[in-house]
Curated annotation (Swiss-Prot):
Record keywords, A-Z: Chemotaxis, Cytokine, Developmental protein, Disulfide bond, Gastrulation, Growth factor, Secreted, Signal
Positions bound to heparin: K41, S42, N43, I44, K45, H46, L47, K48, I49, L50, S51, R62, Q69, K85
Protein name as annotated: Stromal cell-derived factor 1
Stretch list, region Receptor and heparin binding: 29-33
Lineage: Eukaryota, Metazoa, Chordata, Craniata, Vertebrata
């Protein structure tokens, strides 16, 4: 094998070993693609608020009756009120 070919092959193999194993599409995908808007507060066990640079505000809820996780529409009135209360409470603590 030619020395140039061997050097090129070793460089290519080295860069393959250094790259992260996730495809670009998985790195930038938002967790919520669909939103539920007709979920009563009483059916929710807890909320998780996700905010990333690539996605708009994402609110993930775990349901009480089956433990399923769903994405809630952040424009729903009761969610807006909940977020406002949470932000006010956080501002008072600091």
């Amino acid at each position: 094998m030619d020395i140039r070919t061997l050097a090129l092959l070793s460089i290519l193999l080295g860069t393959l070993c250094l790259t992260e194993g996730k495809p670009v599409s998985l790195v930038y995908r938002c967790p919520c693609r669909y939103f539920e808007s007709n979920v009563p507060k009483s059916n929710i066990k807890h909320l998780k608020i996700l905010s990333t640079s690539n996605c708009s505000l994402q609110i993930v809820a775990r349901l009480k009756h089956n433990g399923k996780q769903i994405c809630l529409d952040p424009k729903t009135k009761w969610i807006q009120e909940y977020l406002e209360k949470a932000l006010n409470k956080k501002a008072k603590k600091t």
